[in-house]
């Protein structure tokens, strides 16, 4: 019997209802009462029998208190433990006060939230909030779920068209949906610090500091404590800054006209509710559309850059003329009616038709609210940004297994110390402390910090290429990618298509490739081009819309005018009366237009789609368009039909299917698709680095195959699997580009022959063939051998990515962020390419920097006023942003730098402003110079903090379409992300290896070497500590190589190569230590009774062990540093390279007594010549032995082979 889940949501995997336990019943209270009571009884009544001294009192009580604190803190570390310790489970929602939520993967952390109850109109409402989403209890279904939105319920168009707005009491709806705002509470510094202070790592580090204090390492312990607290404080400040940034992403409430209770009223935008009717006007500079809406009447030009990242303004048209019985298709034909919250309306056209609802008083377009608050597109993006901050973490399961593996060695070392110490008669309390120190030494506290630093350095490196990431946990995924999928148009080819001419106009022409200019085209063709487009002219004169349509109209001579009119010299004025927007499902668009009082329909679309709508198909129709598509051109067919004169209402009632049937052919539009500059180089690099590159496009298969050959996705002869003929009998046919090879395929009974198909040809598959093959037993085999997918819909792109993931491959999808949203979200690594230029982005960055300086200057001015200090002068870079005056001496200079011509009138006005007296505020005991200098210093640093820190995400940086967003249109973003992904992976492996060896050597040093009486002096410990600090700071700074390697990084640590290398290197280190210790005892016999408490005194044992351990630390970093073929070699990491060289030089100089003064300063004792030779050779043996075993295991056991789907690329590339 399956367990019932109380919550229905895609982000919730499971849930449990909870009731709090009483304090006494909690595991950190009740079980400890008898333990404390037993200790008290033993202490006061049987002290001499059981405790026998203050040391054991401390051990027993310390262990008991530590265990109590540990159990008390466990609920703060794990939400399941918190539920177990603090709550009882129940199945009755009326009893429950809290609920435990288990989230689905990559949707934030699990959590316990309070269940709230409110009585409304006599009925009880039960709900809770989780991750800014509200969940309400539905008594009938016995489940919590988010409030239902009509837009998610597959509604009919008529459900929105008939809406008359809200009436009556809206208290219930306000409670149900909440405010239309982003309520992100900002905790105080101390609240956040308390949260960090109970984290397992922080508690463990403080516990270690306490142990070192007990062992009388005062300076070392207090310094460590200071460093730990400082690092946590810095992390808290960083989180606070990020939360404040998220808070600014909300839209400040402003007044909007809303149709409620059958009249227009002015309300604040935060009061909006779903199904409210609102008037949308041009948004103010600092504002935006307040929520998700659907246009009911009128039209708008919007800029969606703040949401999708795309800066090209889009035309949005209403659903007024859509058939009321049709289903709403938000991802299809109705996409053009959606206004997303957070976007900007640049221009609005009010409704032209009369309706039951009076026109808005502000002349805006009529729209209906679909979603509010965090449920909107912008709200979802902000939620992703907020909760992705928790996701930069190591693989917890692998890290835990790794630590358990190291603990085995720590337990063995502790057992040795206990046995040997007991034999030597050491104080047992001191022995227990030593044993605990050994066990804690193998838990590397640096591990999470180092791995997080690796991911953050990758984020910072990507930001320099204008690539931003909302889900940092995906960066290591990029290092494991098997399959790279690319859209064609706008991704591999440029957005700006070049208009080459018209084809197929004359039926008599023998040359099927003849191109006609606009001057040679008949008027009917010119009129279709002028009508079948969606370009709009803004009030400021800019024309917005598809770049391809802009190029076409410009080449033919049409000028776009206001109010859906076009004008062409010699042709006259053309008015577009109604548009049927392009649909990816229909693969065509249409318009109804009027020219010289004649009404006609103009249709434009894919040649094979238009072919089916023609009343008479011209001869050579297929030959003409296929001839151009084979050579890589983009081909669109034009068609039209005359319409009788009719009224506007009749035009509005026309059915799209009727308009687009019985058409007359008017020619083909031919465009050249230039490849992006970096497309060929990017695909070549991926092919050579064990990746499979495939193309998934909605374009024609012949064009797709041509472009795939140009960029290097396919090399050999290609067969296209498509429908066999015009009939709907589901029969398929493999045919080559020239149609000289054809192999029939019946999906109902045929199977794929590898020797005849996959071993001889590259394969391309169409969307039609994919549908026909649904459920075929060999579909996955076909996908494994397919290079190009053409004429596929957005849903099919999503299906392909999901299937490749199910087949066990790591997938990457690179698309344009508008048509490819589903596929981008399904891929392990989704990359949305936007259309920015580097120059434009630099200008935007400079603008942001100046805005930051302006805000900081205003804050500093307020700070001065609070301390009764004079206002500091305005810095020159932002002088033009403030009015002239005595405190703005650089005003004229700043205006000149911005290109303003300084007229005598401007100069006179500035002089007058500068001559005004400045109110001098009494210094109030503080010097005037210091605060002003502070302000200047802060301003100079504003906006320039670009280092190795992960950049703070802002709206407009990230696209809601994909986890990765490239603001540049460069395909090289793919290789940059893979490069950084491999770098992060390699960093992870190297950190595990280095920390493992350091911990193992530390366990050996704290046990066997310590018991032998070896102690190190302050100077020696300082040198060793500095080496480790420099190396740990430098090690993750290795930059990835420009060229992607054919080799692939290890995906995990538990394999023969990694574990074999760690254990073998450890064995080499132990062997050299044992050998040197043996040689030392020959010269300096071991004391029969070692005094472990004595002060440090130089000895041959101390000298030899310290020098060899110094070299072991060098070899640990140098041998396990992961450089080529993934990152720059160790010599390029200057800090680490010279640090290691310096320490190696110190060790060799000390071992050979090359500089006697150095040995004296380091507190080393003189050595015999024979011992110096043995010591030096042992140092070399230790280093080269470690190097040898590492390379042995790497050569024989490293699993760097590509997956089977990637191997095929190598095979075909070698044809």
Swiss-Prot record:
Disruption phenotype: Impaired mitochondrial transmembrane tail-anchored protein localization, characterized by mitochondrial transmembrane tail-anchored protein accumulation at the endoplasmic reticulum. In addition, a wide spectrum of phenotypes is observed, including induction of the endoplasmic reticulum unfolded protein response, defects in lipid and sterol homeostasis, and dysregulated protein N-glycosylation, topogenesis and turnover. The active site is at residue 487. The ATPase activity is stimulated by phosphatidylinositol 4-phosphate (PI4P). Its EC number is 7.4.2.-. The modification Phosphoserine is found at residues 324, 936. Mg(2+) binds at residues 487, 489, 816. This is Endoplasmic reticulum transmembrane helix translocase. It comes from Saccharomyces cerevisiae (strain ATCC 204508 / S288c) (Baker's yeast). The lineage of its organism: Eukaryota, Fungi, Dikarya, Ascomycota, Saccharomycotina.
């Amino acid at each position: 019997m399956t367990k019932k889940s109380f919550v229905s949501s895609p982000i919730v995997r499971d849930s449990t209802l909870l009731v709090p336990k009483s304090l006494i019943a909690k595991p950190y209270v009740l079980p400890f009462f008898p333990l404390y009571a037993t200790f008290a009884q033993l202490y006061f009544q049987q002290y001499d029998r059981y405790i026998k001294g203050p040391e054991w009192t401390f051990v027993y009580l310390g262990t008991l208190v530590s265990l109590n604190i540990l159990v008390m803190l466990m609920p703060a570390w794990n939400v399941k433990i918190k539920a177990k310790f603090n709550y009882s489970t129940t199945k009755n929602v009326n009893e429950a006060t809290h609920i435990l939520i288990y989230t689905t993967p990559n949707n934030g952390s699990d959590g316990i939230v309070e269940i709230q109850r409110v009585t409304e109109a006599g009925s009880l409402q039960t709900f809770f909030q989780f991750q800014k989403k509200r969940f309400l209890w539905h008594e009938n279904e016995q489940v919590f779920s988010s409030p239902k939105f009509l837009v998610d319920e597959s509604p009919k168009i008529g459900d929105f068209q008939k809406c008359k707005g809200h009436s009556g009491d809206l208290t219930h709806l306000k409670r149900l949906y909440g405010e239309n705002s982003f309520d992100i509470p900002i905790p105080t510094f101390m609240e956040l610090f308390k949260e960090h202070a109970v984290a397992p790592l922080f508690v463990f580090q403080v516990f270690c500091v306490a142990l070192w204090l007990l062992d009388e390492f005062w300076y070392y312990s207090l310094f460590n404590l200071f460093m730990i607290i400082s690092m946590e404080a810095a992390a808290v400040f960083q989180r606070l800054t990020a939360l404040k940034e998220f808070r600014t992403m909300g839209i400040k409430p402003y007044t909007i006209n809303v149709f409620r209770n059958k009249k227009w009223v002015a309300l604040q935008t935060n009061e909006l509710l779903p199904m409210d009717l609102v008037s949308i006007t041009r948004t103010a500079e600092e504002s935006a559309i307040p929520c998700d809406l659907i246009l009911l009447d009128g039209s708008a030009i919007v800029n969606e850059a703040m949401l999708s990242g795309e800066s090209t303004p889009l035309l949005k048209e209403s659903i007024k003329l859509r058939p009321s019985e049709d289903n709403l298709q938000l991802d299809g034909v109705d996409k053009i009616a959606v206004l997303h919250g957070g976007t900007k309306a640049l221009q609005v056209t009010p409704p032209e038709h009369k309706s039951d609802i009076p026109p808005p008083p502000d002349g805006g377009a009529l729209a209906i609210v679909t979603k509010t608050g965090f449920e909107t597109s912008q709200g979802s993006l902000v939620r992703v940004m907020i909760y992705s901050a928790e996701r930069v973490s190591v693989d917890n399961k692998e890290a835990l297994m790794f630590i358990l593996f190291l603990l085995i060695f720590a337990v063995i070392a502790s057992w040795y110390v206990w046995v040997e110490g007991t034999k030597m008669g050491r104080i047992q309390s001191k022995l227990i402390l030593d044993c605990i120190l050994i066990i804690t030494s193998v838990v590397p506290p640096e591990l999470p910090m180092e791995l997080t630093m690796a991911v953050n350095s990758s984020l910072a490196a990507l930001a320099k290429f204008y690539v931003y990431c909302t889900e940092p946990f995906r960066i290591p995924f990029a290092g494991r990618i098997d399959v790279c999928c690319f859209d064609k148009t706008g991704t591999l080819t440029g957005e700006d298509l070049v208009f080459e001419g018209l084809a197929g106009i004359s039926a008599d022409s023998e040359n099927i490739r003849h191109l006609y200019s606009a001057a040679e085209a008949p008027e009917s063709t010119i009129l279709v081009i002028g009508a079948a487009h969606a370009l709009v002219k803004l009030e400021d004169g800019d024309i917005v819309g598809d770049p391809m349509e802009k190029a076409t109209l410009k080449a033919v001579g049409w000028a776009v005018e206001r109010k859906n009119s076009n004008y062409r010299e010699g042709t006259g004025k053309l008015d577009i009366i109604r548009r049927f927007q392009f649909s990816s499902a229909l693969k065509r668009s249409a318009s109804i237009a009027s020219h010289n009082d004649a009404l006609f329909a103009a249709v434009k679309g894919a040649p094979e789609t238009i072919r089916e709508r023609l009343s008479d198909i011209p001869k050579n129709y297929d030959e003409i368009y296929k001839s151009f598509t084979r050579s890589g051109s983009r081909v669109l067919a034009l068609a039209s039909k005359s319409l009788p004169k009719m009224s506007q209402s009749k035009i509005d009632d026309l059915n799209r299917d009727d308009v687009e049937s019985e058409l007359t052919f008017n020619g083909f539009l031919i465009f050249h698709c230039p490849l992006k500059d970096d497309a060929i180089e990017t695909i070549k690099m991926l092919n050579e680095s064990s990746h499979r590159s495939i193309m998934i496009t909605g374009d024609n298969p012949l064009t797709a195959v041509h472009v795939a050959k140009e960029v290097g996705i396919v090399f050999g002869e290609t067969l296209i699997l498509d429908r066999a003929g015009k009939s709907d009998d589901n029969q398929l046919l493999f045919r080559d580009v020239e149609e000289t090879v054809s192999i029939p395929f019946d999906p109902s009974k045929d199977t794929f022959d590898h020797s005849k198909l996959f071993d001889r040809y590259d394969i391309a598959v169409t969307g039609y063939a994919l549908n026909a093959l649904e459920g075929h037993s060999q579909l996955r085999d076909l996908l494994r051998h397919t290079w190009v997918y053409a004429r596929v819909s957005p849903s099919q792109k999503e299906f392909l990515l999901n299937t490749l993931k199910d087949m066990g491959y790591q997938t990457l999808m690179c698309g344009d962020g508008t048509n490819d949203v589903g596929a981008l979200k399904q891929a392990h690594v989704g990359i949305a390419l936007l259309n920015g230029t580097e120059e434009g982005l630099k200008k935007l960055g400079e603008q942001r920097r100046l805005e930051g300086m302006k805000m900081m200057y205003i804050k500093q001015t307020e700070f001065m006023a609070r301390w009764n200090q004079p206002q500091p002068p305005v810095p020159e870079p932002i002088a033009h942003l403030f009015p002239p005056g005595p405190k703005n001496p650089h005003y004229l200079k700043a205006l000149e730098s911005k290109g303003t011509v300084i007229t005598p009138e401007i100069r006179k006005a500035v002089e007058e402003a500068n001559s005004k007296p400045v109110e001098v505020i009494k210094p109030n005991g503080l010097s005037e110079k210091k605060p002003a200098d502070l302000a200047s210093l802060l301003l100079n640093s504003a906006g320039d903090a670009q280092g190795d820190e992960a950049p703070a995400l802002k709206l407009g940086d990230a696209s809601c379409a994909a986890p990765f967003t490239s603001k540049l249109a460069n395909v090289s973003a793919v290789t940059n992300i893979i490069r950084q992904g491999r770098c992060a992976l390699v960093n992870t492996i190297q950190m595990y290896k280095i920390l493992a060896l350091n911990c193992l050597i530390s366990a050996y040093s704290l046990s066997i070497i310590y018991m032998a009486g070896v102690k190190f002096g302050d100077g020696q410990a300082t040198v060793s500590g500095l080496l480790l600090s420099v190396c740990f700071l430098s090690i993750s700074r290795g930059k990835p190589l420009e060229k992607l390697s054919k080799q692939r990084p290890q995906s995990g640590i538990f394999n023969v190569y990694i574990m074999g290398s760690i254990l073998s290197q450890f064995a080499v280190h132990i062997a050299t230590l044992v050998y040197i210790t043996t040689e030392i005892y020959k010269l300096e016999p071991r004391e029969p009774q070692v005094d472990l408490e004595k002060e440090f005194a130089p000895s041959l044992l101390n000298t030899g062990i310290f020098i060899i351990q110094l070299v072991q630390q060098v070899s640990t970093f140098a041998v396990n540093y992961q450089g080529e073929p993934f990152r720059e070699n160790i010599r390029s990491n200057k800090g680490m390279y010279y640090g290691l060289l310096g320490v190696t030089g110190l060790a060799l100089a000390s071992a050979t007594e090359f500089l006697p003064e150095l040995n004296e300063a380091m507190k080393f004792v003189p050595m015999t010549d024979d011992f110096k030779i043995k010591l030096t050779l042992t140092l070399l043996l230790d280093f080269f032995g470690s190097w040898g075993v590492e390379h042995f295991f790497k050569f024989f056991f490293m699993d760097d082979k590509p997956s089977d789907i990637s191997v095929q690329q190598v095979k075909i590339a070698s044809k």
